[in-house]
Regions:
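Non-catalytic positions within long, well-ordered alpha-helices that form the structural scaffold/packing
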Residues: 139-142, 239, 258
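Generic non-transmembrane alpha-helical segments
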Residues: 199, 203-214, 301-309
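Zn-dependent metallopeptidase/amidohydrolase metal-coordination segment
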Residues: 248-286
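A short, charged, Gly/Pro-tolerant segment at domain boundaries
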Residues: 315-350
């Protein structure tokens, strides 16, 4: 005989989904989400309807356009010609905003992302550039290679204005920049003896040759803080020390790209002889702009050829730069730091 006053309810229904293990059913009772690529599934117990499976849209339905090749344009190169399906993308990073909206598109069948280093209209000093935001944003878009284009002064007679150089070494004489993603409870020391990607550098040099542009396949780029140009004494010192070209931006990008495990190489467009050459006047901004205007078309051709010639395979060590660089015990890294650097360190510190 049944006891009076006691209502017997049927046990809660269970979710019988073929891809869900029995141990995960309890997750659904707490409204936890399982998130396949295109669908969020939520399973909850309703007092009258039993277990209900509902579909909800992802939090971010709009996906950012992806790109595999990032191009950073410097002085004189503020856009990239021939981009199909172009779209502006504005990205917020934990380090602030990039220099400019990034333009993504298709070149020679490959997706690229173009970023004007100094902003459109050349509004940002070398010291003011948010280098971390620039590299981080390109990483977020999926870039695994970065090609940089910049103006430089020559410290050698044989490196003439109008010619290009693909630097293989850098010397850092900057003073007022943050050139690392790390800190905040996480220490890392990446190997930087070879600061550029040899495979990418070879593609850039070969592309210059293909386009009929005289190119020097290696050289040492000294990076000064600026924005002033060198004194005569500094120019002679740089020559005495064996440096080849001088600029104000590339070494900071190269360091951050290495920490982000991105291939990086630079096309240095020679615009002047700095101030050391007795047969040439001291460098001026107007002189640089005039030479850059002559070289801009060459740079556009070289970039298109480089994108076309870029192999899908990577034969370098850039993508594993952090494998032996992270020093701090993962258990001691602050959660906020892990979250901030997740796109960079995620595969090492989930």
């Amino acid at each position: 005989m049944a006891c009076r006053g006691v209502i017997r309810r049927p046990p809660p229904a269970r979710c019988n989904l073929p891809f869900i293990q029995p141990s995960t059913v309890d997750l659904f009772r707490s409204n936890a989400r399982i998130e396949p690529a295109a669908l969020h599934l939520r399973c909850a117990f309703h007092p009258r309807k039993g277990t209900v499976l509902s579909k909800t849209k992802p939090k971010s339905a709009a996906k950012r356009p992806q790109a595999s090749i990032g191009i950073i344009g410097g002085s004189g190169l503020y856009t990239m010609k021939g981009l199909f399906e172009s779209k502006e993308v504005r990205i917020k990073t934990p380090f602030g905003d990039p220099s400019e909206a990034i333009v993504t598109g298709v070149v020679e069948g490959k997706r690229v992302a173009f970023l004007a280093r100094h902003g459109r209209g050349h509004r940002i000093l070398p010291t003011e550039i948010n280098y971390r935001a620039n590299i981080y944003a390109l990483k977020l878009l999926g870039c695994d290679r970065i090609v940089s284009v910049s103006a430089v002064g020559s410290l050698r007679e044989e490196l003439a204005p109008g010619e290009f150089l693909v630097a293989d070494q850098f010397v850092d004489r900057t003073k007022h920049r943050v050139s690392t993603f790390f800190g905040g409870g996480l220490v890392a020391h990446v190997t930087f003896d070879k600061p550029t990607c040899p495979q990418l550098s070879s593609v850039l040099a070969d592309s210059c040759v293909h386009c009929g542009v005289k190119v020097h396949r290696k050289g040492t780029y000294i990076c000064m803080e600026g924005p002033q140009f060198s004194t005569l004494a500094e120019a002679h010192m740089h020559r005495f020390l064996g440096f080849d070209v001088i600029g104000m931006t590339n070494v900071t990008e190269a360091k951050l790209a290495r920490e982000a495990e991105l291939c990086y190489s630079s096309i240095a467009m020679i615009t002047d002889y700095d101030c050391w050459h007795p047969g040439h006047e001291s460098v001026t901004g107007a002189q640089i702009v005039a030479t850059l205007n002559q070289n801009a078309e060459n740079a556009q051709h070289v970039l298109r050829e480089a994108v076309k010639a870029m192999p899908d395979e990577h034969h370098c060590k850039c993508a594993g730069a952090l494998a032996h660089a992270l020093i701090t015990d993962p258990k001691l890294v602050p959660a906020a730091t892990k979250k901030r650097l997740a796109p960079i360190i995620g595969k090492y510190m989930p």
